Amino acid sequence: MSRLDTELVNRKIARSRELAKKYIKDGLVFVNEKNICKPSFNISDSDIVEYTGENEKYVGRGGLKLEYAIDKFNINVKDKICLDIGASTGGFTDCLLQNEAKLIYAVDVGSDQLDLNLRKNVRVLNIEKTDIRDFKKLYPNISFDFICTDVSFISLKKITEYAVELLKENGEIVFLIKPQFEVGIENIGKRGVVKDKKLHIKLLYDLINYFNMLGLDIIYLEPSPIKGGSGNTEYLIYMKKNQFGEQFKTFNDVEKIVSKAMTPTEKTK
């Protein structure tokens, strides 16, 4: 007997246990024609397991968010050295691989999260138990053409200066902005959702000003096509390292972007 989530990986139905758990909890897995929503459910080799969802393009749905940014903002990562901050299971890393990045440093404070196939890929360096704020001390001679970030439980203000320090001149950055980790706990509603439109506008302007202060030009800002796990509206911001002496490029259409992003029920305040 073995756990259902483990067996999904063994049978090549899911690429990782994290993805297997998601399939199961989303009600997409049947055992002997019975829907099972418990990852720890025990099955035998003779049990018939069926997955009823669509094939995943990336190991995590974050890959679809980065794919959207790459297509929308016309970003080219081919043959570039990239850094994925907060790699987790590797959705962003997988997307970079499929877009022909030369080498990807997948960094995360956790461990045993990155998809096994990504760990085996010679173009991926799996750097676990590492805070990006300590990265420069550990790898003092490395700089990056492209940096992407999808982090939780920490404000982007806590890590951006370290990312900029690692970025080559005229290097590119894509950040996924998650409002629930930027507005303060007192402004978070039920299930961790930030519904107040004014808070979205304020935090975006605040971050943009901060990014400019650190030497980044704001090229594009767009709502993510996929909401966060709790239903939060998220944003993708594309930036470049400013060339010394040039006037900073900023972004003034935040209200329009937020209105575009939020559903009518989210715009009530």
Give short role names for the model-derived ranges.
Residues 1-47, 81:
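A basic, amphipathic helix-loop patch mediating RNA/tRNA/ribosome contacts
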Residues 61-80:
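Conserved alpha-helix/loop element of class I SAM-dependent methyltransferases that forms part
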Residues 78-88:
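Conserved class I S-adenosyl-L-methionine
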Residues 89-101:
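Conserved SAM-binding loop of SAM-dependent methyltransferases across substrates and taxa
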Residues 105-158:
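S-adenosyl-L-methionine
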Residues 157-174:
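A short glycine-rich, Lys/Arg-flanked "PGG" loop and its adjoining helix->strand segment in the class I
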Residues 179-195:
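Short, glycine-/aromatic-enriched active-site segment of Class I SAM-dependent methyltransferases
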Residues 233-269:
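Flexible, glycine-/basic-rich loop-and-beta segments that form/coincide
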